[in-house]
């Protein structure tokens, strides 16, 4: 199991949630100006994602990271967005001006940055990416020396320094940082990913369609699959700076499904722009989301005697069918608020080694410290190879309860959640569902949207309930439409 090392000397532990409901967990994000649930994110060249602010962010982070007389090192990676070059340069200027050495690794998946931060004994890792968002967005996310996302307290300290008017102590010219490019970073991650696959197995005879979303996995994912023996059919592996997530990848799996059916592949794999999440389809083209992958993986890990915590950690968004599938095998489902960082915190605090989100952020803690789309895909391929069964049959371990998810775009900074019309609509939906379903309404931590999720046995009924709540949110948000 990957060990949880100390992060910085002034931060002793990562605080874990005491309970598993989104309402009762620490609401640290309410006091934030820039950091959301997954770092800082926004449209490139528009506040806050401007080069001047990112330069200041680099200086603030460098000030916080610089503890004692030790020379500190930070890994910097990015996905394939055009604006990545601009933000990489801004971060380099800010960090090196504070005496921080920077190691640039180029376009690589987010989980590769987590791995390299540990492997190269760096003090921190930084990924420049907006994940599944369109190319015009970008973001900055931080990792500690243990390869885990920074705890809330440390992000808040960086933000405090960023917003303050204090004159930061600057190093003398002899003590400025240096920037160096690591040329073999891709090869290092390829070998690391392969170590998660059983040494006595190969993928010979398996035809795999892989959609890289024109993103960070465009080189590494096909290479890993090919080296393990698979026949690889690639999609979305020609990034041009503006086509990342553009009709391809985990948010748009239709092309993957179509290609699987055309070439009669055994499985389809689709990553998002930074490859920290994955969506898979079986040989018939049926989509398997993160909940199904968690169910399959949990049962296989239990069979092998390697599942810890007697269950799985997921979020309040996970389908009730996952909970039922696990319960049938004597396993529990622990739920956290939305965000893979909170899933990981609960896993660490309570001894679990498997967790994730319905969206495809899956954490196999024995292999990596963050959601890793490639390692998640390899775990499914290993299961297919071990069981010698088609994926459609393996996926039958879980029966989904009908679930509807709708999004409403709102004005940035607005909060319609306390509006009486919204409160009344939610109460009415809860009354109609009773004990036969559930409703969850929450603001996104990464986009100006409110997400409405309704579960129940009747698809038409829950769709109508979700639409009613969305209409109330639209009215409370002065006419902003559906997203």
From Swiss-Prot:
PANTHER family: PHOSPHOGLUCOMUTASE (ALPHA-D-GLUCOSE-1,6-BISPHOSPHATE-DEPENDENT) (PTHR42946:SF1), PHOSPHOHEXOSE MUTASE (PTHR42946). This is Phosphoglucosamine mutase. Keywords: Isomerase, Magnesium, Metal-binding, Phosphoprotein. Its cofactor is Mg(2+). It is an enzyme of class 5 (isomerase). Binds 1 Mg(2+) ion per subunit. Its EC number is 5.4.2.10. GO terms for molecular function: magnesium ion binding; phosphoglucosamine mutase activity; phosphomannomutase activity. Catalyzes the conversion of glucosamine-6-phosphate to glucosamine-1-phosphate. Belongs to the phosphohexose mutase family. GO terms for biological process: carbohydrate metabolic process; peptidoglycan biosynthetic process; UDP-N-acetylglucosamine biosynthetic process. Activated by phosphorylation. GO terms for cellular component: cytosol. It comes from Magnetococcus marinus (strain ATCC BAA-1437 / JCM 17883 / MC-1). InterPro entries: A-D-PHexomutase_a/b/a-I (IPR005844), A-D-PHexomutase_a/b/a-I/II/III (IPR016055), A-D-PHexomutase_a/b/a-II (IPR005845), A-D-PHexomutase_a/b/a-III (IPR005846), A-D-PHexomutase_C (IPR005843), A-D-PHexomutase_C_sf (IPR036900), A-D-PHexomutase_CS (IPR016066), Alpha-D-phosphohexomutase_SF (IPR005841). The lineage of its organism: Bacteria, Pseudomonadati, Pseudomonadota, Alphaproteobacteria, Magnetococcales. Mg(2+) binds at residues 131, 272, 274, 276. The modification Phosphoserine is found at residue 131. It holds the Pfam family PGM_PMM_IV. It catalyses: alpha-D-glucosamine 1-phosphate = D-glucosamine 6-phosphate. The keyword Cell division does not apply. The active site is at residue 131.
């Amino acid at each position: 199991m990957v060990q949880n090392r100390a992060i910085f000397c002034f931060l002793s532990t990562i605080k874990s949630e005491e309970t598993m409901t989104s309402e009762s967990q620490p609401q640290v994000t309410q006091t934030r100006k820039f950091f959301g649930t997954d770092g800082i994110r926004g449209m490139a060249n528009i506040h806050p994602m401007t080069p001047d602010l990112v330069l200041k962010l680099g200086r603030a982070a460098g000030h916080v990271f610089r503890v004692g007389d030790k020379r500190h090192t930070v890994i910097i990676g990015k996905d394939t967005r055009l604006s990545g070059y601009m933000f990489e340069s801004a971060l380099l200027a800010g960090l090196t001006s504070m005496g921080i050495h920077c190691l640039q690794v180029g376009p690589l998946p987010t989980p590769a940055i987590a791995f390299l931060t540990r492997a190269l004994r760096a003090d921190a890792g930084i990924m420049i990416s907006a994940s599944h968002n369109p190319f015009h967005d970008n973001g900055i996310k931080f990792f500690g020396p243990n390869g885990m996302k920074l705890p809330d307290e440390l992000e808040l300290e960086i933000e405090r320094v960023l917003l303050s008017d204090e004159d930061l102590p600057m190093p003398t010219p002899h003590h400025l940082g240096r920037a160096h490019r690591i040329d073999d970073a891709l090869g290092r991650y390829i070998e690391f990913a392969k170590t998660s696959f059983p040494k006595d197995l190969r993928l010979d005879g398996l035809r795999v369609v892989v959609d890289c979303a024109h993103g960070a996995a465009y080189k590494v994912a096909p290479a890993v699959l090919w080296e393990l023996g698979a026949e690889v059919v690639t999609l979305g592996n020609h990034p041009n700076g503006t086509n990342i997530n553009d009709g391809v990848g985990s948010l748009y799996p239709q092309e993957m499904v179509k290609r699987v059916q055309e070439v009669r592949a055994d499985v389809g794999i689709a990553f998002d722009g930074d490859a920290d999440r994955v969506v898979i389809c079986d040989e018939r083209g049926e989509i398997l989301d993160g909940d199904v992958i968690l169910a399959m993986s949990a049962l296989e890990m239990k069979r092998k005697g390697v599942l810890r915590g007697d269950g799985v950690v997921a979020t309040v968004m996970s389908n009730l069918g996952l909970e039922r599938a696990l319960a049938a095998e004597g396993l529990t489902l622990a739920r956290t608020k939305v965000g893979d960082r909170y899933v990981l915190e609960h896993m660490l605090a309570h001894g679990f080694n498997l967790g994730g989100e319905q969206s495809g952020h899956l954490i196999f803690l024995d292999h990596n410290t963050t959601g890793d789309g490639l390692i998640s895909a390899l775990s499914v391929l290993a299961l297919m190879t071990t069981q010698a069964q088609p994926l459609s049959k393996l996926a039958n371990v879980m029966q989904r309860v009908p679930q509807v998810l709708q999004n409403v775009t709102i004005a940035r900074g607005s909060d319609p959640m306390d509006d009486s019309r919204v409160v009344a609509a939610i109460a009415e939906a809860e009354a109609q569902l009773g004990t036969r379903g559930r409703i969850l309404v929450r603001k996104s931590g990464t986009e100006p949207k409110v997400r409405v999720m309704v579960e129940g046995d009747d698809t038409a009924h829950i769709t109508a309930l979700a639409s009613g709540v969305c209409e109330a949110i639209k009215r409370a948000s002065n006419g902003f439409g559906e997203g």
